[in-house]
């Protein structure tokens, strides 16, 4: 019975993530999607769950014809703080400052997502500027 229960949970997990992303894309008229490349060195179970969610997110974006951009943690830190080895708190403080927030976003995943968005905005602006020089 356990394998069927496990498949049932995965089915609902995938369905929930897909529908949620699909709704966000449609309700907020999202043009592009930026995600962080996976990096896990400790908890394999967490890595698998995050990888599954990430795949579903990418599928939902693809079905909605939204380009997906990936950034490494080093690129995110470089794009937000200007230093690829910045500490998490430095990144959070810079995100708070750049977005004119009253306090550091919580939980940490929210702050990370905003940092990825800021990184992408900077990278996108640079890419457009470089295209204008051609």
Identify the residue ranges that each predicted region occupies.
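Phosphate- and other anionic-substrate recognition elements at nucleic-acid/protein interfaces
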Residues: 1-134
